[in-house]
Amino acid sequence: MAASQQQASAASSAAGVSGPSSAGGPGPQQQPQPPAQLVGPAQSGLLQQQQQDFDPVQRYKMLIPQLKESLQTLMKVAAQNLIQNTNIDNGQKSSDGPIQRFDKCLEEFYALCDQLELCLRLAHECLSQSCDSAKHSPTLVPTATKPDAVQPDSLPYPQYLAVIKAQISCAKDIHTALLDCANKVTGKTPAPPAGPGGTL
């Protein structure tokens, strides 16, 4: 009985020593490594893409070659459709190859034109705001696309917000003063304010 117990314990210990790894089973699992950060050209390419998304002029320059290619395709498809319709009217056999639809090419061309128009409008609006900012607040403010290009005389953004709020308050005061003066001249009594802040 003791011999059989010794044999059973020896067999169990041998099985424990061999284990799943010795039998060809999977070993210890490796921990997943975190994704590598973008460095070098990849990071610069990402920054350039972000600048193109923010800058309407860069996006306009990027869309111009696409517009030229779309116009060439549109003219080519129009010529092919015209030739095919002429051959059909004359009773001749048309080409067996598939021909692109003219309306699809025209729709793509107009879509690119709409994008270019939006870019030009946005660029014009940015230029107008820049001119107004340079006129009423000549101190520079760091932009979101170039946060590192901070000059010594630049104005911090919180302080810039305070300046803008002061300008808005001054504009409201001027508007109220002009409205009171106009009411006194015409003899009208001013209407009571609709809320705590009043109405403009």
UniProtKB/Swiss-Prot annotation:
Its main location: nucleus. One of its GO terms (cellular component) is core mediator complex. One of its GO terms (molecular function) is transcription coregulator activity. Keywords: Acetylation, Activator, Nucleus, Transcription, Transcription regulation. Widely expressed in embryo and adult. Residues 1-48 are annotated as: Disordered. Residues 1-21, 36-48 have a biased composition (Low complexity). The modification N-acetylalanine is found at A2. It is found in: Nucleus. One of its GO terms (biological process) is regulation of transcription by RNA polymerase II. Pfam families: Med29. Component of the Mediator complex, a coactivator involved in the regulated transcription of nearly all RNA polymerase II-dependent genes. Mediator functions as a bridge to convey information from gene-specific regulatory proteins to the basal RNA polymerase II transcription machinery. Mediator is recruited to promoters by direct interactions with regulatory proteins and serves as a scaffold for the assembly of a functional preinitiation complex with RNA polymerase II and the general transcription factors. Belongs to the Mediator complex subunit 29 family. Component of the Mediator complex, which is composed of MED1, MED4, MED6, MED7, MED8, MED9, MED10, MED11, MED12, MED13, MED13L, MED14, MED15, MED16, MED17, MED18, MED19, MED20, MED21, MED22, MED23, MED24, MED25, MED26, MED27, MED29, MED30, MED31, CCNC, CDK8 and CDC2L6/CDK11. The MED12, MED13, CCNC and CDK8 subunits form a distinct module termed the CDK8 module. Mediator containing the CDK8 module is less active than Mediator lacking this module in supporting transcriptional activation. This is Mediator of RNA polymerase II transcription subunit 29. It comes from Homo sapiens (Human). The gene is MED29.
